[in-house]
Amino acid sequence: MRKRISAIIMTLFMVLVSCNNGGPKLKSDEVAKSDGTVLALAKISKKIKDASDFATSVKEVHTLVKSIDELAKAIGKKIHNDGSLTTEDGKNGSLLAGVHSVISAVKTKLGSLEQKAIGEFAGMKVQVVAIKTASIDLLNKFKDKNAELGKNEVSNDDAKAAILVSNTTKDKGASELEALNTAIDGLLKAANGAVEAAITELTVPVKVEKPSQNN
């Protein structure tokens, strides 16, 4: 995304510089189009970069959360000697420990993301805090269900109730994980929207006011 945005900005800069002949006097970081509209490139470029950086951080968290769906496919499985997965029921303790580690990393990243949710992204801070709370709720559920989940011989049914969001029974963490998925989807959509809004400023510039003819 960063490379694409940089290419957009550089291309636009080269095109608009050629249109600066005549018209109102511009600041050093502004360029004007032939129709009299002006773009403050430095300001718009910073907005795009900041929005892109924030969205990238959100995407990292989103990827971690969604990775649990893939891990859930390994419930009741082990690696066969031919490289494929084969059945091994009731040995899901290490798998759940791995999921716990992923969610702990999510919680840490959300703490950092919360510090970035300032300025133009302050409106998303509530979402970030809600997602961090959802991650804590999931970790707490794992702790509460330690008798069933905190051992090597975790049954397939208990593992599914913990990390398989499509499972019918979700009383060991899957319900909290489902809420976490929904929340991070919403934040990613909002973050991407901020990027699009910043880019839109390139195509919807502010019109330069012409000098009054009454002087």
Swiss-Prot record:
Keywords: Cell outer membrane, Lipoprotein, Membrane, Palmitate, Plasmid, Signal. Residues 1-18 form the signal peptide. InterPro entries: Lipoprotein_OspC, OspC-like_sf. GO terms for cellular component: cell outer membrane. Its main location: membrane. A lipid is attached at residue 19 (N-palmitoyl cysteine). SUPFAM superfamilies: Outer surface protein C (OspC). It comes from the Bacteria. It is a lipid-anchor. It is found in: Cell outer membrane. The keyword Lipoprotein applies. A lipid is attached at residue 19 (S-diacylglycerol cysteine). Belongs to the variable small protein (Vsp) family. The Vlp and Vsp proteins are antigenically distinct proteins, only one vlp or vsp gene is transcriptionally active at any one time. Switching between these genes is a mechanism of host immune response evasion. Genes for both Vlp and Vsp families are on (usually) unnamed linear plasmids in B.hermsii HS1. This is Variable small protein 13. The lineage of its organism: Bacteria, Pseudomonadati, Spirochaetota, Spirochaetia, Spirochaetales.
